[in-house]
Amino acid sequence: MSRTTAIDIDPASDIDDLPATSQPVQFIKRGTPQFMRVTLALFSAGLATFALLYCVQPILPVLSHEFGVSPASSSVSLSISTGMLAIGLLFTGPLSDAIGRKQVMVTALMLASVCTLLSTMMTSWHGILVMRALIGLSLSGVAAVGMTYLSEEIHPSFVAFSMGLYISGNSIGGMSGRLLSGVFTDFFSWRIALAVIGCFALASALMFWKILPESRHFRPTSLRPKTLFINFRLHWRDKGLPRLFLTGFLLMGSFVTLFNYIGYRLMLSPWHLSQALVGLLSVAYLTGTWSSPKAGAMTARYGRGPVMLFFTSVMLIGLLLTLFSSLWLIFAGMLLFSAGFFAAHSVASSWIGPRARRAKGQASSLYLFSYYLGSSIAGTLGGVFWHSYGWNGVGGFIALMLCAALLVGGSLHKRLR
């Protein structure tokens, strides 16, 4: 996946939280030079973040061969990053509340870029995993804070537009990271591929630092563990939020598992695809640029529950197509699966804001935590099924998760309609 969650923003609540002054509140409006600087900075940050996070996914077979590890062990290079990102989300959001948005994001992106460059020098598998863990932990500082910065600084009338550009950067970054690493690995080596992506991300971090305006509406708050715990308990006692968290876990777990191991399958007989062609399969992600807004329009007409269930079913249909031996059917299945995932995920994530009674930012962080935890756990477990049962085993594992997502989504719709 490489896409960031689309979270509902309540502009009114942001405005009310601003300090009272005798001067009118100045937000950044569309069409101004500052708006262009903000959108360019956040777009490039989102692109770099998800390129760094997912660049290893298409080269998992290469890492398996070079370091002599199993597919399940190779997938840990991605799972450990998403797992540490999930854990970091619980801390970097509150940290940015205390010390500032821009400082956290700039530091996070620079650290992740440097760790990616260092990973190209590692000669042991454990060294690779340490670097990948640090990359995931660092990137949580961008994932947790980017949307908060936009909701604080952009005029409420243009928040949705700027958020859309930011999310586009995330999705394009996830695709380009996979695409570049696959192609460069095929023509050069995986070390050169990661070095190129690391240098690009470092340049993005420097540009981000230079052009992103300082926060005007940020007010530092002290870290209060007691308040965080009270809100945490409130969210888990809600009749809908825990089901949404579980839905995010299952959807992302299914998505990452399919793309982790489809490359292994297609590099075998009878297809024998090259590493570059496996990387090119990430263009399937582009279906999300159509399906996500389509899901939003359908939600306004039919409601969140039915639309989420429909697109989860689309994922299941796409998965079934990948079980055939025709390459065209497999790719069609990947297109359907990706379209269904991005649409279902956007509906689930947009449900968080309206459901949370307070501390909506923390509720969104808990959703993202569950989302990336699903990527980490399911992405690794899929390797066990691949090793023991081949693609049919992986497909069965994903099908179980999607059926569970349908059951959870059905109960969610029944409870909240």
Regions found by a protein language model. Give the residues of each.
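Juxtamembrane intracellular "pre-TM" segments in multi-pass secondary transporters
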Residues: S22-T32, P213-F245
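Helix-breaking motifs and short loop linkers at transmembrane-helix boundaries and internal kinks
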Residues: G68, G100, M121-G127, H155, ...
